[in-house]
A protein has these predicted regions:
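Long, low-complexity segments enriched in small/aliphatic residues
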Residues: 1-65, 214-215
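Long, contiguous, secondary-structure-rich segments that constitute the structural scaffold
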Residues: 62-76, 80-235
Length: 235
């Protein structure tokens, strides 16, 4: 196709140096930007955008069997971070960024690196109250509530797309009063199902053979996409 039509660039070729970006006042070459730094108020970094393994984006939360496996929004966290924050597995917490906060239950996994929190995408509870005031739990659980929208340190300057990784955040335990409010609105807190710890493929162990699928044990390098594929492993 592209041998005949060329690419959708002024030259019709692959352009590593973009004259279009240059005309708009941006750097015409790819460049690296340091992630926004953490601080005392927001000592952790979160990444969002990946759904729970059991669901498809924002969908399928009405399926009883899937909700038995993952009944609530969960925050994936390393054992060291959980111990430092005095949070136990399955405990209700609040995750806060500079733009907002959501509730979720901590899911301690040895494959998570220290300092990083994974927040699954698109949480809501279709069985709960609807309407603008409640939005079926979206105001309490959805990652859209904590995604920055105007911080230049956390935006793709060329397109205005918010960063989904490396966003400074904090996680803290919530009070019994707050837990009671959540349970009144959304039902009792049920046990979080736990499957065996998923094994993650070391990036430095990958040979050129794309069929290679040998996995290693704990304490290995973390890669976000591999956590999405293998992290919870409840089946």
């Amino acid at each position: 196709k592209y041998l005949k039509t060329g690419f959708a660039t002024p030259s019709g070729k692959v352009e590593l140096y973009s004259e279009t970006l240059e005309d708009l006042g941006f750097d015409p070459l790819p460049y690296y930007r340091e992630a926004a730094g953490t601080n005392e108020e927001y000592p952790l970094r979160m990444f969002i955008g990946l759904p729970d393994d059991e669901y498809f984006r924002t969908g399928m939360r009405h399926v009883p069997e899937l909700r038995k496996r993952v009944p609530d929004q969960t925050f994936f966290m390393s054992p060291n971070d959980a111990e430092r924050l005095r949070i136990v597995d399955g405990q209700w917490t609040r995750l806060t960024t500079k733009v907002g906060s959501v509730f979720g239950r901590v899911f301690v996994r040895s494959s998570m690196p220290d300092g990083l929190v994974r927040v699954p995408h698109g949480w809501w509870k279709p069985e709960s109250k609807k309407g603008l005031e409640n939005m079926s739990g979206m105001w309490d659980f959805c990652d859209a509530r904590i995604t920055t929208d105007d911080d230049p340190e956390l935006l793709d300057l060329e397109q205005g797309i918010p960063h989904m990784k490396g966003v400074p955040c904090s996680v803290e335990k919530i009070s019994e009063t707050e837990i009671a409010r959540l349970e009144k609105a959304y039902g009792p807190t049920n046990e979080l199902k736990r499957g065996p710890e998923g094994k993650v493929l070391r990036s430095d162990a990958k040979p050129n053979d794309f069929m290679f699928d040998e996995f290693t044990g704990d304490g290995i390098e973390f890669e976000a996409i591999e956590l999405s594929l293998y992290g919870r492993n409840t089946i």
